[in-house]
């Protein structure tokens, strides 16, 4: 049995929706145990509420528990071409795991969301830097998801990982094509984890 963690931060629900699609794909793989968790909110509650933040139901992860998983699929919105501050704060607490080599050889993959598309690939690849310092095996999705070739509509999705475009005001929700790419990412990573650890 390979243990897969889908770990995310979502303020307005776009990444939360994508996380559930990633988990849905991962659960298709026999021998994969899939868990969804989120990183803690760092914003004061009154500011979070005033900004229109969406309450999340997923349990909150601790940095130490990352060592318990064979693969971790990280989801984060873009903040100026980087991961969100909440995800950064969480990962900055993994120094003990780094010192002990606890994440070395584990699979790591990333999905993201942006307002208008700017920064989606940069967010994924800049997150990879942290995973590389931990010695994780970085798993992009390539172009195996056929939806990546569809240019008939506005759509997120990259060979680096699934993405969604929320629109400048956040009103656009993940499309079926974007969710399909997210499901593919989950299934692909889980399949590799089972082959390596199952």
Curated annotation (Swiss-Prot):
Cofactor details (free text): Binds 1 FMN per monomer.
Catalytic reaction equation(s): a quinone + NADH + H(+) = a quinol + NAD(+); a quinone + NADPH + H(+) = a quinol + NADP(+)
Top-rank EC class of the record's enzyme: oxidoreductase
GO molecular function, one term: NAD(P)H dehydrogenase (quinone) activity
Superkingdom field: Bacteria
EC number(s) recorded for this UniProt protein: 1.6.5.2
Signal sequence, start to end: none
Residues annotated to bind substrate: 98
Record-linked Pfam families: FMN_red
Binding site for FMN: 10-15, 78-80, 113-118, 133
InterPro entries membership: Flavodoxin/NO_synth, Flavoprotein-like_sf, Flavoprotein_WrbA-like, FMN_Rdtase-like_dom, NQO
Presence of the UniProt keyword NADP in the record: yes
Record keywords, A-Z: Flavoprotein, FMN, NAD, NADP, Nucleotide-binding, Oxidoreductase
Start and end residues of each Flavodoxin-like domain: 4-189
Gene3D superfamilies membership: 3.40.50.360
Any GO CC annotation of this UniProt entry: membrane
Residues annotated to bind NAD(+): 12
Cofactor: FMN
UniProt key word Translocase: no
SUPFAM superfamilies: Flavoproteins
Similarity comment text for this entry: Belongs to the WrbA family.
Protein name: NAD(P)H dehydrogenase (quinone)
Source species of the chain: Salmonella typhimurium (strain LT2 / SGSC1412 / ATCC 700720)
């Amino acid at each position: 049995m390979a243990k897969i963690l889908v770990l995310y931060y979502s303020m307005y629900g776009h990444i939360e929706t994508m996380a559930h699609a990633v988990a849905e794909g991962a659960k298709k793989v026999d021998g994969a145990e899939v868990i969804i968790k989120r990183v803690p909110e760092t914003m004061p509650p009154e500011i979070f509420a005033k900004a229109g933040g969406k309450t999340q139901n997923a349990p909150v992860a601790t940095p130490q528990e990352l060592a318990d998983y064979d693969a971790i699929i990280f989801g984060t919105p873009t903040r100026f071409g980087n991961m969100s501050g909440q995800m950064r704060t969480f990962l900055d607490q993994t120094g003990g795991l780094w010192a002990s080599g606890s994440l070395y050889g584990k699979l790591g993959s990333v999905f993201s969301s942006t307002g208008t598309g700017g920064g989606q690939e940069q967010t994924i690849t800049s997150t990879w830097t942290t995973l590389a310092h931990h010695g994780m095996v970085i798993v992009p999705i390539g172009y195996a998801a056929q939806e990546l070739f569809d240019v008939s509509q506005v759509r997120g999705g990259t060979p680096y990982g699934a993405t969604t475009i929320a629109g400048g005001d956040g009103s656009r929700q993940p499309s079926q094509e974007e969710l399909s790419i997210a499901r593919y990412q989950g299934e692909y990573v889980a399949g590799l984890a089972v082959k390596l650890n199952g």
